[in-house]
Structures are given as C-alpha cells and as structure tokens.
Amino acid sequence: MKASVIIPNLNGAGWLRDSIESIWAQTEQDFELIVIDNGSTDESLEIARSYCGNPRYHLIENSENTGFSHAVNQGIAMAKGEYMALFNNDAFAEPNWLEELLKTAESDPDFCGIQPDAALLRAGTGR
C-alpha cells in the first residue's frame, strides 16, 4: 500500500463527511484511510462508522478525548502505508492532492516531510 491517510476527529460532524469524501475521490487510490474519533459528543462518530464497510477504511474509537497527538500516534501505529499523510477533519482535498504529495515525496530521497499548498476559506463567504 502506497499511503495511509490519517484523520483525527473530535466533534467534526459539520465537516467530516465532506473531508472523507474528498479523500475517497483522489486520483491516487493506493491508500487506506484511518479515522481516529477522540470521544466525540456530536454525530461525527456515527458519520465515521458509516464507512466501516470499506476494506480500506479503519476506525479507532476512543471513549474520551486523549488529545490530538495521541490520536495521530494511534493512526500511525495502525498505518500500513509506505507514506503517511495527516489530514484534518475540517479540510477538503483536491482530487490530485495525494497523487501530487506522493510524486513530490518520491522525487527526492532526502525529503522527510512535505506540506501542500493550502487556502483558508471562511464558511459561507466563498473566500
């Protein structure tokens, strides 16, 4: 498996589905998706559970908020990919996001971390 995409989640019901769907829509499909729910009290855990039928999807359910770093480390421990991509629960990936990250990562063996370009959008404003 080429990549593991890791999404830590805490009360992300307003964004999580769009975030996950943007990952499934990637041009690069050799990846697994790992969502770590950190004790959410909104509907985001139910959203996360709705993807459990996909064999490339893994869900870790924490009964309480163990912190962002711990959740990320749980995802890394489960990951089987050659590369790991951390993705926020309120982010949206363009269809070629993972493909371009992997191309860049493989272009130079000295690269140890890569950050894509990002745009900050305010909900409802279009800017």
Regions flagged by a language model, labelled:
Residues 62-79, 89:
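Glycine-rich, basic loop-to-helix element that forms the pyrophosphate-binding segment
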Residues 20-21, 45-46, 73, 81, ...:
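Short alpha-helix within the catalytic core of nucleotide-sugar-dependent glycosyltransferases
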Residues 66, 90-92, 118-120:
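Acidic metal-phosphate-binding loop of nucleotide-sugar-dependent transferases
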Residues 12-25:
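Short, well-formed alpha-helical segments that are part of the catalytic scaffolds
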Residues 84:
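Short aromatic/hydrophobic "clamp" motif used to bind/position activated sugar donors
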Residues 22-61:
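Acidic donor-binding segment of Leloir-type glycosyltransferases
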Residues 2-4, 32:
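Cell-envelope/extracellular polymer assembly enzymes that use nucleotide-activated donors
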